[in-house]
Amino acid sequence: MNKIIKNSIKTLSMCLLATTSFIGTACSDDDAPITDYSWNIEGNTTVNIMPERYQLQRNLMSGWVIYAGIGSGMMMDFWDLYDNFESSEGTVKVSDYGNTLYVRGLWSNFNPEKGKYVWDESVQTEPAKRFRMLVEGAKERNLKLAFTFVCDSRDKHEDACPDYVKEAGAEGFTTTTGSVNVWTPYPDDPIFQREYEEFLTAFAAKYNDPDVTQFVSGFGLGKWGETHTLKYSTGDEAPRQAVFEWITDVMSRLFTKVPIMINYHRCLLSGKEFSDTDTDVAADMVKRAVAKGFCLRHDAFG
């Protein structure tokens, strides 16, 4: 038995030594490409790349974002806090690691009145002041912007939809968050769709710019703007496919220079809860959205 154990340890040690040698070779500081194979094949182009091994690379896969908002919970000293962020490595500047400021906000905060938007200097609402503070700070720190809009008021303490939409005759439903009654338009309502498209058109005119915007996350419908558990005017899911076609067509038409994202999950535009949804329907919608130019993302992962 002892002999078997000794042989096993000996074999393991040899494997570790071999692995160590391999790793040492792979991590060599010699940057000159060495090969005994000739790539000089007719029609090929040879490209030699010298690896950068010492400089910090920011967020290589671009999946990690710096979350922010423009609602009442946002701090006006946001940048001071994030430039002096306590971490396990000591005080760090968050923008040294991330390259995207992700701004989530209620449609009503982005668009408080018809034709009035937070990026207009004439708009002096508190959300507008927060928005401009965030945008200016992002520019100073060489960060691009990303956005999610929220049209559904459930779980909110104020209406996510601007008042002028309801005043224009859009139909919707009322829910209660704590002691506050909030109103949400039905996503299949034609007046809501007209007004939301007008907002998206104005937003795209300003932010369909790859030098400024990293991505725009669709669609803004359902809980948290993430297409969860929608309530349609019919009381069932009959409008689901038509709403999908409408919102994907609008966003793919307006955002032609920056990535548009779809929140992928089993409840996509469904009126049902998680366990009751048909995953095949959601999977088909994801494929169709991708065919229209959408990318995939999930707020659980960035």
Where is each model-derived feature located?
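Bacterial Sec-dependent N-terminal signal peptides
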Residues: 20-44
